[in-house]
Curated annotation (Swiss-Prot):
One of its GO terms (biological process) is translation. This is Large ribosomal subunit protein uL23cz/uL23cy. SUPFAM superfamilies: Ribosomal proteins S24e, L23 and L15e. Part of the 50S ribosomal subunit. GO terms for molecular function: rRNA binding; structural constituent of ribosome. Pfam families: Ribosomal_L23. The keyword Plastid applies. Signal peptide: none annotated. It comes from the Eukaryota. InterPro entries: Nucleotide-bd_a/b_plait_sf (IPR012677), Ribosomal_uL23-like (IPR013025), Ribosomal_uL23/eL15/eS24_sf (IPR012678), Ribosomal_uL23_CS (IPR001014). Belongs to the universal ribosomal protein uL23 family. The keyword Protein biosynthesis does not apply. It is found in: Plastid, Chloroplast. The lineage of its organism: Eukaryota, Viridiplantae, Streptophyta, Embryophyta, Tracheophyta.
Amino acid sequence: MDGIKYAVFTDKSIRLLGNNQYTSNVESGSTRTEIKHWVELFFGVKVIAMNSHRLPGKGRRMGPIMGHTMHYRRMIITLQPGYSIPPLRKKRT
């Protein structure tokens, strides 16, 4: 399982870093317990809470045909005080 796809750097996610909360996009088929176990195992941290929501795909037009991009899942991971995750690579657009 790959777990985390990439870190998310928005105004809200940068503000949440002050509360020891990290935001990232994950595989849409993964569950909270899988991601929690993967984060604790890979980074060696203690997770106390996980919030997730699924973001819808955007509409894309190719000539007369209307399509859409895939939806994805975003997790906000809260760590115990004293733990931190090193910065993840930002997705290149």
